[in-house]
Amino acid sequence: MPHVDLNPLKQRMQAARAAAVAQFRQHPRPDMLLTELRRIVDQALRELVKLCPLPAGATLAAVGGYGRGELYPHSDVDLLILLPQPPSAADARAVEALVAALWDLGLEPGHSVRTLEDCEREARGDITVETALLESRWLAGSRTLMKRLDSAMQARLDAAVFFQAKRVEMQQRHARYQDTPYALEPNCKESPGGLRDLQVILWMARAAGFGHSWREVAQAGLLTSSEARDLRRAEQAFKRLRIELHLLTGRREDRVLFDLQPGLAAVYGIASTATRRASELLMQRYYWAARLVTQLNVILVQNIEERLFPRPDSDARLIDDDFRNLRERLDIVREDGFERNPTLLLRAFLVMQQHPELIGMSARTLRAIWHSRHRIDAQFRRNPVNRKLFLQILQQPRGIVHELRRMTMLNILPRYLPVFRRIVGQMQHDLFHVYTVDQHTLAVVRNLRRFTMPEHAQEYPLASQLIAGLDRHWLLYVAALFHDIAKGRGGDHSELGAREVRRFAQDHGLDPADAELVEFLVRHHLLMSAVAQKRDLSDPQVVRDFAAQVGDERRLAALYLLTVADIRGTSPRVWNAWKGKLLEDLFRLTLAALGGAHADAHTVLTERKDEAARLTRLAGLRDDAREAFWNQLDIAYFLRHDASEIAWHTRHLYYQVAPDEPVVRVRPTEHGEGLQVMVYTRDAPDLFVTTCGYFDAKSLSVQDARVHTTRHGWALDSFIVLAPEGFADLRAQATLVEHELAERLRDPHAARHAHAPRRLPHSHARRSRVFPVMPQAELSPDERSQSWRLSVTATDRPGLLYALARVFAEHGVDLIMAKIMTLGERVEDVFIVSGSALERPRSQMQFERAILDALAGDEPRQQAA
């Protein structure tokens, strides 16, 4: 085939597309741009087939979205080359030349070459192919063959079968996206509540003969005019978002990625406020639109199902005067029931809880609730009957989380609790929350509910035991609903939330003790986590101070339960068994303190040594051998380690008090997710740096570090480290660490050059780059000792602890203890340190600057001594 110069056609097409985009920038009307881009490509293709002819009798058809008449700036151009018979060699060459020309033209064709029989066979086996062919549109070639395809597709279309297949396909797609529209980086095309859901409804409606557009579907009685208007608005919003994503990235990109969210917000003219990022405001708009689509999708799919598979209403069984069971769905008896008696807007959810045979609500009921939600106003909220109903929903033995989720989706909970409305769809770009505030809140309620279920007792033994003994544990659900309700307002969200829940408690008639409990829980919902993860629990004063703040055992149990549920509802990556152990340790120590066991340091020391001695005797150690080793240890060591750790150290070190080689011993932790590492060697300035460098290179995440120097100058350091995710054989890992770390300590200088920090997963690195945490460092003297407390906050990154350890070594600062608190991609660490450099203002300032540089990822500044 002779060479065809496509440059003139390509240049005309590119100029026309650029003009269309420029027009869109002046007047951002999505449909106008999509139609114009489609028209430009239609015209280019018709010119192209004159230059590169189709095989004789063949048809060129647009399919899929392009066939529907929409073309996004960087979408594939979906084409069908329809042949009247299987291709000859000449036909194959003609098709090959045409496809090559499509690429040369700068289009990205998604093409298929089929006969009519091929199309029918493929459509029978794949609902996606059938849907694409149903939207086929003639571009060039044989119109007769195109009509035969249209006739064949319509003839084989079975509305009922098509509906069921599309519903299954939609359910599978939703499952791939975790069944939530609230993803951190949603796909505006494929995620639940996105463009694809809108297209599915129209495909179903079209197949059933209810129309091709929202107006026609409304005329068929499946939609009200206001619903059609809402869906049309949402569709336009998502179309524009998808267009902006393509234009912003210069590629086919349908995901609202972290990196793109600030740029998108700027395109939309959304500015940051004093309390919220522009990207958070953008995403809240997205989630509100996706929630609307999700809800109307449920109503419409049920409506179409009821039309396609009609069953007589005689199947219905009355539940009471207002509701009936219609095919295992809750159905309102009177269409105007909610308008006549708005109290039913809450009672509907209570009835759902009380009737486990119900699998959902009928489309009629969902629609009636949706359209009556405006009846929940100030007068409704003041009504004692409604207040009692709301508390009853929280007090039911089943269905609490399901109904709270349904109430949120139908906009009933945000209407009843206006303060809750502010947090619906509110994303927190803080590097550790992976849910919107409302979804996190409901996840906390779900976790609290799980504590009450026997099937989860093995997973949460202490929590299950405590909640079973907690009087009126439904108060925890109230605290959960309000614990983050003031997020995004500025100020202390715990304090603001406490005021909101106090008002709720007064309005809903909670007795004074219960009102005081929920207010305490909301005000102090972060307290237990902070103390457990940032303070030294071996210090009796820390426990006494915490016990004084908590006050009594009921508060302690409730705070423990809320804390565990809260952390576990933040992100799958934030919770680990080590945090669980710290919280449980703090709970038990505080319980003892509240019970009158106000032990001073001397009593704690005596009891701990007695228990450790008992454990060493059980291991066969003689008292004199043990005491020879213990004589090298001071009081601080015994106060900082529990009896089990002391006994473990003693068993391995009593016979080698001054060894020539480093001693490294490792064992799996009690909770089975990490390793406990003991390092015993002659003390050296770079010891902590070397050890941290090894852990970092092996992707072992340090959770806790305790550094001790014996009376005769040996370092006895203890670490809790977590193994990489998915590492199952902890005993094999323990053996490997014992060998490798001992080797590293024998020759630390050679190892320094071999250190290669671990890498964060790509998505985490992107998120932390776009939404970094401002590095903070606060150095303050410890009021009860000669040491200092260094608190740091920063974005997590490979080698961070190693970088800090190097700063300690370079400034002559000794580490006594480290408490590492990792919250997703954010770290909040506390170090107890000492050193003469901290006593002089100038060198202290240089140390703090170097710490900030390390937190920010910069090379330490060279300071004059």
Swiss-Prot record:
SMART domains: HDc (SM00471). Residues 676-762, 789-865 form the ACT domain. It comes from Bordetella bronchiseptica (strain ATCC BAA-588 / NCTC 13252 / RB50). Residues 1-318 are annotated as: Uridylyltransferase. It comes from the Bacteria. This is Bifunctional uridylyltransferase/uridylyl-removing enzyme. One of its GO terms (molecular function) is [protein-PII] uridylyltransferase activity. Its EC number is 2.7.7.59, 3.1.4.-. Gene3D superfamilies: 3.30.70.260, Hypothetical protein af1432. It catalyses: [protein-PII]-L-tyrosine + UTP = [protein-PII]-uridylyl-L-tyrosine + diphosphate; [protein-PII]-uridylyl-L-tyrosine + H2O = [protein-PII]-L-tyrosine + UMP + H(+). Residues 747-767 are annotated as: Disordered. SUPFAM superfamilies: ACT-like (SSF55021), HD-domain/PDEase-like (SSF109604), Nucleotidyltransferase (SSF81301), Nucleotidyltransferase substrate binding subunit/domain (SSF81593). Residues 319-675 are annotated as: Uridylyl-removing. Residues 437-559 form the HD domain. Pfam families: ACT, GlnD_UR_UTase, HD, NTP_transf_2. Belongs to the GlnD family. Transmembrane segments: none annotated. Keywords: Hydrolase, Magnesium, Multifunctional enzyme, Nucleotidyltransferase, Repeat, Transferase. GO terms for biological process: regulation of nitrogen utilization. The keyword Cell cycle does not apply. NCBIfam families: PRK03059.1, UTase_glnD. The gene is glnD. Modifies, by uridylylation and deuridylylation, the PII regulatory proteins (GlnB and homologs), in response to the nitrogen status of the cell that GlnD senses through the glutamine level. Under low glutamine levels, catalyzes the conversion of the PII proteins and UTP to PII-UMP and PPi, while under higher glutamine levels, GlnD hydrolyzes PII-UMP to PII and UMP (deuridylylation). Thus, controls uridylylation state and activity of the PII proteins, and plays an important role in the regulation of nitrogen assimilation and metabolism.
